[in-house]
A protein has these predicted regions:
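Asp-based, Mg2+/Mn2+-dependent phosphohydrolase catalytic module
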Residues: 1-8, 123, 127-228
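N-terminal helical cap/lid subdomain that shapes the substrate entry/recognition surface
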Residues: 5-15, 19-100
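Short, acidic loop-to-helix structural element flanking the phosphoryl-transfer center
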Residues: 7, 87-117, 123-127, 150-151
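Short catalytic-loop micro-motif centered on adjacent basic/acidic residues
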Residues: 19-20, 116-117, 143
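Short beta->alpha linker loops
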Residues: 25, 56, 97, 101, ...
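Active-site nucleophile and cofactor-binding loops and adjacent substrate-binding regions
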Residues: 51, 119, 146
Length: 228
């Protein structure tokens, strides 16, 4: 294969922490929402949130109330929390910096490869944010919660006609990795030095600066077939 040709026919990105530096924005929002319950609860909320990137905020709300507050969250309360969370984060995510290398990659590759987004952010909000950041034209499709990553990836496989081993999921959380394994697609982790959550053998980059080189290198990405 020519070194100028990518080893994949479609790329799927998580959003927060992979394309945009927005993880801290959402961490602060969770902390603010649970601040009335005290410092210890806030610490538990933040730790669980950071350990479960890519999980829907609504799943997190339910877990936090059940595990840390000892009660079941009502549907009305869940909707209210979701609205408050969106109000805290949406403008900040729109204004957030790019992950290093992300904008350059999207600009340089969107006409060469079909690119997709699979996020734990509610889909309507995700589409608004991507639109207001001027990113819509980069992607063939954008999908978010309430669907899980595995289901989204299977949908993208069906839409694109790309074989599983020729689709690459790029994510920064085990939720992304697990979704890739479930859908049978290849995976690349994004993790800063010293903060790699992925199993041994999974390739990792610190950001997207070297992603173009990765795509045309002979070194393979993690394949879900290796788990079987």
């Amino acid at each position: 294969m020519s070194m100028n040709l990518p080893r994949f026919d479609a790329i799927v990105f998580d959003f927060d922490g992979v394309l945009v530096e927005s993880v801290d924005v959402k961490t602060r929002a969770f902390a603010a929402l649970f601040e009335p319950y005290g410092e210890e609860v806030v610490k538990q909320v933040v730790a669980w949130h950071l350990a479960h990137g890519g999980v829907s905020r609504y799943e997190k709300f339910r877990h936090f109330h059940r595990a840390f507050l000892g009660r079941v969250l009502s549907q009305v309360e869940e909707v209210e929390l979701g609205n408050r969370f969106s109000a805290l984060v949406e403008e900040a995510v729109i204004a957030a910096a790019w992950v290093p290398g992300a904008h350059e990659f999207l600009e340089g590759w969107h006409a060469r490869l079909p690119l997709y987004v699979a996020s734990g952010t509610p889909e309507e909000e995700l589409i608004r944010i991507i639109g207001r950041r001027g990113m819509t034209h980069f992607f063939k499709a954008v999908a978010g919660a309430p669907r899980k990553k595995g289901a989204i990836l299977r949908d993208f496989l069906g839409r694109s006609g790309v074989s599983q081993d020729r689709m690459l999921m790029v994510g920064d959380a085990m939720t992304d990795f697990d979704g890739a394994v479930e859908a049978g697609v290849s995976f690349l982790g994004i993790a800063p030095a010293g903060a790699n959550p992925f199993p041994h053998g999974v390739p990792v980059l610190p950001d997207l600066i070297g992603f173009s080189t990765f795509l045309v290198a002979s070194r393979p990405a993690f394949s879900a077939a290796e788990r079987t």
